[in-house]
Amino acid sequence: VRSRVISAFAAEEEKRVLSLKPVLAPHHGRYGDHPHQVYDAWPAEDPDAPLVILLHGGYWRYDRMHLTPFAAYLAGQGLSTVLPGFRRSGGAGGYPKTFEDVARLVDTLPGGRPYILAGHCSGGHLALWCAARGLLPPGSPWHTSTLPTGVLALAPLTDLAATRRDGLSDDAALQLMGGEEGFDAHMTSVDPLTLLSGAGTTGVPTVLLHGEVDEEVPLTQFSDYAAVHHDLRTVVLPGTGHYTLIEPGAPAAREVADTLWRMAREQRGPGTTAGPTDRRATASGTGLT
């Protein structure tokens, strides 16, 4: 296990964001029978508002509660937001259960409803993996031709081999994959960079957004993926770390919300309008009910 040394800037940012009080969602639901197969929903007032499925980070280990303030913030910007739980490393999850849950979640969405799959850190890895499921062999249980209508990956882990090599977050990639033997046997089916190699694109409109001074996820994870994805859009935010991307009201978080709205307008045409709202809505705006 490698010791973790971060700057005072990164330590203060992490403490500030992760100490935010969790926000209770107005709606909750299930997509399976396991206790972790649940979701929280913050519908926007407009039932036709863009739908964002938000996958939390935490190097596949931690739960979704730290992301509830950001989910509520996105809803306040007029984006219907769903924050799911899933089985995680170190407990009920890891390979293959974490991937089974995320695939099951997105596969339960009503056909034809556009949605943007967004994820932070390891949630970004899972979002990019979902975009690449069409590149899996047809015999894979996770292969599908029904893909997200857009993906926004925030400070994502794109390369599991590099994550293992660098020992990120106390060898989190090895824990996810069940150790060295499991890693080598199964990585090719769940690693976004590996799946993308040779294809050059997933066919899903994708944006990568990373903080220039992120000390949790190296910028090389961003640049190495961008180097092989032919039609990717990339944004590097100067002076921005890992956690301010999900800090409600921070300039980086506003950039995330603006990016989601731009993606939604591109999906739905120039008539789509943006506008923040803090008023409550019915559960129908989540797309999962």
Language model features with spans:
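Primarily recognizes the serine-hydrolase "nucleophile elbow" in alpha/beta-hydrolase
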Residues: D107-D166
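N-terminal cap/lid segment of alpha/beta-hydrolase-fold proteins
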Residues: R2-D46
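Short beta-strand/loop motif that positions the catalytic acidic residue
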Residues: T202, L208-H210, D214
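Mobile cap/lid helix-loop segments that gate and shape the active-site cleft of serine hydrolases
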Residues: L18, A162-L195
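The serine-hydrolase catalytic nucleophile loop
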Residues: Y62-A71, F86
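Conserved alpha/beta-hydrolase "acid-adjacent" motif
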Residues: E215-Q221
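Catalytic histidine-centered segment of alpha/beta-hydrolase-like enzymes
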Residues: T240-P251
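Alpha/beta-hydrolase active-site loop
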Residues: G93-G111
